[in-house]
């Protein structure tokens, strides 16, 4: 009886039917393609055991002149700088007030009321008290999260009970951090609604849906960080200044020498070569109204000077296609800017115009501010119904998973989409919310060298490739505790964030293929596997290989004829189990290779099956 070699095209293709994709793969999870063959992806471990408040959707590693490597980290609740696997809270302050005498009122529990007629806070905001005297100074001096608001009074929860009555003394100072943001988009709210337009954040401006989701943008300015929340101010933090890591970010507009600094911004970046600070969606010079289509830049090498004069290169430009500018990324030659309807190029031209702008394409979309990435000087991004690429010109990026992704995509949470790269494997990853999920739970990957796609399930909210870090890093979030952590990705082959480590389940399914010519039923009685376990750390790594037969493309798979093969590997890596005997009957079949053991790494080659004709019925 002849052997039939199973030779399959790399990548996952869901653009047709299962049967029409004969010779390809249909589905996978935690599997990538390397050199054309599927293999299990790497595992992950804790980059740091420390937690931080909120879900981090923005991360930027950068290196100071002193050699220190830091990471700016923006969450929906705070802003941090990571150094040495420790997270330092540099969240800017919105306001500092001196409270009236005995501003705290206890009721014998850990719920304490605070009176401050000069500040309107929001639920979830953070405040730090100092100067508290009396019996509860050790309890009330410190940082707290606001839990309830009623007029000029709000509540906090303390670590121990405070007796009934007023307390605190007459010299209490309350330092309020900038308002917290949402972890997801909530319908019916946004800029100009609720607490978003209060206090130091300025007047209400309507610049589109989805902006309630807290997204920070950030870029390094030498040893310093320039950063800010979307719709908020422009902040500066310098590692070498003052107390260093314990120094909070400072509002640029309040710094000595600041002139006409934007009140609002929706995106911040620093041009690599020309050293301008650039904002999108800010207020123009002489205006306090945010313009969502405005590009504005500072004077060269001067983040404090924003007034356009004959002596500066500060300036601005309104772009005309779209209703709001979404994001921007730098390539070697230019800055690429996305609106919700077009793509533009921004290039330094020198005085008097400073920057020139070109429309690269219109009638385009982008899922959100974190949906674009530049890899090897090529821009890739996820739109609302397709993928795009810019490599000299804008094109739709053909995808064998386009329908699969966008037919199961929660467009209401599109601004949660985040992207990252794994240059080691030539991959661009997008993480997104499936149709029935309000948080990220899926990923789709494009291999730009092999021009193939694959997908799976994983919840990562920000991703930065290795470079300044040994491994790619990604953020995770526990909604119940409102705490986040950073994982190091592509570490081993298991989940090392638990103790002991837990296995990562992985599988890949082929599409249906005919047994012989497909006219007759075939009886498969032997499988010659071709699986490598090179790199496995387990003592007996195994995979399950399962054949699923069926009679016709529209018929169910015959569960009764299903035969699983468990292949052990206890000999040198390049020596394989010679053969496995089975009995599986059908006109067409698919197979699955899956693993769920600890320390298992595998790569699938070209297995073979032996079959004989077995009638037409």
Positions of PLM-derived features:
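Small/polar beta-strand repeat architecture
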Residues: 1, 9, 15-16, 89-214, ...
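Beta-sheet repeat architectures centered on beta-propellers
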Residues: 1-96, 184-186, 192, 196, ...
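Beta-propeller and closely related beta-pinwheel folds
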Residues: 43-66, 91-94, 197-211, 244-417
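A fold-level detector for beta-propeller and closely related beta-sheet-rich head/sensor domains
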Residues: 70-74, 228-231, 256
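Predominantly extracellular/luminal cell-surface or secreted proteins
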Residues: 82-84, 128-132, 157-159, 237, ...
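Acidic Ser/Thr/Pro-rich low-complexity disordered segments
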Residues: 88-94, 136, 161-163, 186, ...
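Hydrophobic or amphipathic alpha-helical targeting/insertion segments
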Residues: 89, 223-237, 244
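Short linear, low-complexity motifs centered on an aromatic residue
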Residues: 234-254, 540-552
């Amino acid at each position: 009886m002849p052997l039939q070699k199973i030779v399959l095209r790399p990548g996952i293709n869901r653009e047709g039917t299962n049967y029409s994709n004969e010779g390809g793969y249909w589905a996978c999870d935690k599997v990538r393609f390397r050199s054309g063959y599927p293999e299990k992806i790497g595992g992950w471990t804790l980059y740091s055991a420390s937690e931080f408040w909120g879900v981090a959707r923005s991360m930027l590693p950068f290196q100071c002149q002193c050699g220190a490597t830091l990471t700016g980290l923006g969450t929906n609740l705070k802003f941090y700088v990571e150094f040495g696997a420790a997270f330092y809270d540099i969240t800017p302050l919105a306001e500092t007030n001196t409270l009236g005498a005995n501003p705290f009122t206890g009721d014998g529990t850990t719920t304490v009321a605070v009176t401050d007629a000069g500040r309107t806070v929001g639920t979830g905001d953070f405040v730090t008290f100092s100067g508290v005297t009396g019996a509860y100074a050790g309890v009330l001096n410190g940082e707290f999260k606001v839990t309830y608001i009623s007029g000029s009074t709000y509540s906090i929860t303390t670590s121990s009970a405070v007796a009934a009555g007023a307390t605190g003394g007459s010299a209490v100072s309350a330092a309020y951090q900038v308002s917290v943001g949402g972890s997801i988009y909530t319908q019916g709210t946004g800029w100009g609604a609720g607490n978003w337009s209060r206090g130091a954040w300025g007047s209400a401006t309507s610049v589109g849906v989805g902006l309630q989701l807290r997204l920070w943008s950030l870029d390094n300015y030498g040893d310093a960080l320039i950063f800010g929340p979307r719709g908020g101010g422009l902040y500066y933090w310098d590692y070498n200044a003052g107390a260093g890591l314990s120094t909070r970010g400072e509002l640029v507009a309040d710094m000595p020498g600041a002139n006409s600094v934007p009140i609002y911004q929706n995106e911040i970046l620093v041009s690599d070569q020309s050293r301008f600070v650039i904002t999108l969606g800010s207020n123009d010079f002489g205006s306090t109204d945010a313009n969502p289509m405005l590009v504005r830049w500072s004077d060269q090498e001067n983040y404090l000077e924003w007034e356009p004069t004959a002596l500066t290169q500060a300036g601005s430009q309104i772009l005309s296609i779209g209703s709001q500018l979404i994001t921007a990324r730098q390539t070697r030659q230019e800055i690429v800017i996305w609106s919700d309807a077009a793509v533009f190029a921004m290039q330094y031209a020198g005085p008097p115009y400073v920057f020139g702008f070109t429309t690269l394409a219109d009638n385009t979309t982008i899922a959100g501010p974190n949906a674009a990435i530049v890899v090897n000087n090529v821009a890739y991004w996820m739109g609302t119904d397709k993928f795009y690429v810019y490599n000299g010109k804008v094109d739709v990026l053909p995808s064998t998973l386009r329908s699969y992704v966008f037919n199961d995509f929660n467009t209401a949470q599109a601004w949660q989409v985040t992207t990252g790269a794994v240059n080691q494997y030539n991959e661009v990853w997008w993480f997104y919310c499936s149709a029935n999920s309000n948080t990220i739970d899926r990923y789709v990957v494009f291999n730009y060298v092999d021009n193939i796609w694959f997908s799976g399930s994983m919840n990562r909210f920000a991703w930065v490739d290795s470079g300044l870090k040994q491994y790619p890093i990604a953020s995770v979030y526990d909604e119940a505790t409102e705490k986040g952590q950073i994982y190091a990705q592509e570490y081993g082959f298991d989940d090392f964030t638990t103790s002991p480590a837990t296995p990562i389940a992985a599988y890949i399914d082929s599409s249906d293929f005919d047994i012989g010519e497909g006219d007759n039923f075939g009886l498969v009685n032997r499988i010659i596997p071709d699986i490598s376990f090179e790199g496995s750390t387990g003592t007996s790594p195994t995979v399950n290989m399962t054949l699923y037969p069926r009679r016709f493309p529209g018929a169910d798979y015959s569960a009764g004829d299903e035969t699983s093969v468990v292949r052990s590997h206890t000999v040198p890596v390049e020596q394989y189990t010679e053969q496995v005997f089975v009995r599986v009957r059908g006109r067409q079949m698919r197979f699955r290779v899956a693993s769920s053991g600890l320390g298992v790494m595998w790569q699938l080659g070209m297995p073979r099956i032996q079959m004989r004709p077995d009638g037409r019925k």
